[in-house]
Amino acid sequence: MRTEYCGQLRLSHVGQQVTLCGWVNRRRDLGSLIFIDMRDREGIVQVFFDPDRADALKLASELRNEFCIQVTGTVRARDAKNVNADMATGEIEVLASSLTIINRADSLPLDANHVNTEEARLKYRYLDLRRPEMAQRLKTRAKITSLVRRFMDDHGFLDIETPMLTKATPEGARDYLVPSRVHKGKFYALPQSPQLFKQLLMMSGFDRYYQIVKCFRDEDLRADRQPEFTQIDVETSFMTAPQVREVMEALVRHLWLEVKGVDLGDFPVMTFAEAERRYGSDKPDLRNPMELVDVADLLKSVEFAVFAGPANDPKGRVAALRVPGGAQLSRKQIDDYGNFVKIYGAKGLAYIKVNERAKGLDGINSPVAKFLTADIVEAILERTGAQDGDMIFFGADNKKVVADALGALRLKLGKDLSLTDEDKWAPLWVIDFPMFEDDGEGGLTAMHHPFTAPRDMTASELKTAPEEAVANAYDMVINGYEVGGGSVRIHNGEMQQTVFGILGINEQEQREKFGFLLDALKYGTPPHVGLAFGLDRLTMLLTGTDNIRDVIAFPKTTAAACLMTEAPSFANQAALTELGIQVVKKAENN
């Protein structure tokens, strides 16, 4: 039906007769001439109808936005004064000789001239996806997946599919369950990841595996999460963690070079402890120049319990955050930031305004100045590198609260005061995570997952001091987003059972949930290492949006609903009866 795409026409096509198919993006009726912007997936081109082709001109008068049409015409160069430098096709136009209206469009529920609500965009997603910026994002996503496949093929990885209907295993989030009609009362689980299957593939001898795969997690959602999402899943045998990171870093550098024309360079490597200490986060945004600086040793003897308490507590921390130019902040702004950090458990926000650095104590303005000596102030100014016009905020509490509160404040100030370089790319690897973390109930939970190996520990050493274990794990972070993560896997049955035991999984439960894995570990398991990237999040970064729904064709809302199809929906009673399922209504509160 077509000979060319609208958005691909250029001066090289001048004089050629072309047939185009697409939609009316805009129509301008000048009486004797009618102009339309005609759009397809590749872009927009101007088409005009003149009186010499009366039938086409008459039919064009009926056109409205989003009519689906076919146009045949001749490509012409525009006069210099009419060239549109903002359009890829702005140097040419098409003189239409014939027009076919394939399908008309009713009045549109989305307004092309205004910002539509996200609810409306998701309900009429098929119309929303016609917008050039949305089409471009999905085209970029397709390019990314193509680049990934070619790269992985070139590096000897095999694309192997793993099951979608599998067994429920604890991986950190709730499973989506699928009832079995054949096995009444039993359920499959949709995979949260192909984790165990890819490890089993390593045990099967496929030493380089990858897959671009759907995963499912029934968890509370936010802007950068979906109940179903896509991973670039990778596993290798007989490779070390640094070797795997080298290959995966090369993949990401390749994507940025091909999609953005940007060379990311070598990625710095930072330990979890350093990231938390300097940035208050295990996924630091290095575009932001501010850092947390420890000052507890300077404040142990002050007559101010808010500082002295945490400064003298082994589990406490006092840290300072220097904000360049922050002395301009008003009292109301400071109060607002004080309320902001309370969200993260902080009790408030002490501060020092640096007016004249050279005057030391006399050159600052601070509600806590009366508790500080000239020597202490000088030491704080020196350690933080404060200059005239800067602000220093303080966090004083247990280590987690200080990291969380000042880490979040750092990001907010970076954005509010334009301190974060939005034109920069800042990737890094974060390594050496704690193996376990407190589950809040007196037990331990795996920081990554239960199949991650500890670094340089035997099973007996791990059993003796699990809280000291460092995971042989790593995350890739770009501009404050965790885009991928992985680890060295446990390939020894004794170690795997030890980890299960530390996590409170008794031997009977181990056999019930992971018997197949424990059996497989008995038969010559190779050392293996893996990683998974979030394709949606990578695409989000590469297309410059901050909402993951913008890079998924048919996403869910933050309530895990599809507004277009109205999923989830009620199942009919016959289907439920056949599955042996009875829906129990939740009792209403009186």
UniProtKB/Swiss-Prot annotation:
SUPFAM superfamilies: Class II aaRS and biotin synthetases (SSF55681), GAD domain-like (SSF55261), Nucleic acid-binding proteins (SSF50249). One of its GO terms (cellular component) is cytoplasm. It catalyses: tRNA(Asp) + L-aspartate + ATP = L-aspartyl-tRNA(Asp) + AMP + diphosphate. Its EC number is 6.1.1.12. It is an enzyme of class 6 (ligase). InterPro entries: Aa-tRNA-synt_II (IPR004364), aa-tRNA-synth_II (IPR006195), aa-tRNA-synth_II/BPL/LPL (IPR045864), Asp-tRNA-ligase_1 (IPR004524), Asp-tRNA-ligase_1_N (IPR047089), Asp/Asn-tRNA-synth_IIb (IPR002312), AspRS_core (IPR047090), GAD-like_sf (IPR004115). It holds the Pfam family tRNA_anti-codon. Keywords: Aminoacyl-tRNA synthetase, ATP-binding, Cytoplasm, Ligase, Nucleotide-binding, Protein biosynthesis. It comes from the Bacteria. ATP binds at R217, D218, E219, Q226, E482, G534, L535, D536, R537. CDD domains: AspRS_core, EcAspRS_like_N. It is found in: Cytoplasm. Residues 195-198 are annotated as: Aspartate. Homodimer. Catalyzes the attachment of L-aspartate to tRNA(Asp) in a two-step reaction: L-aspartate is first activated by ATP to form Asp-AMP and then transferred to the acceptor end of tRNA(Asp). Belongs to the class-II aminoacyl-tRNA synthetase family. Type 1 subfamily. This is Aspartate--tRNA ligase. The lineage of its organism: Bacteria, Pseudomonadati, Pseudomonadota, Gammaproteobacteria, Enterobacterales. The gene is aspS.
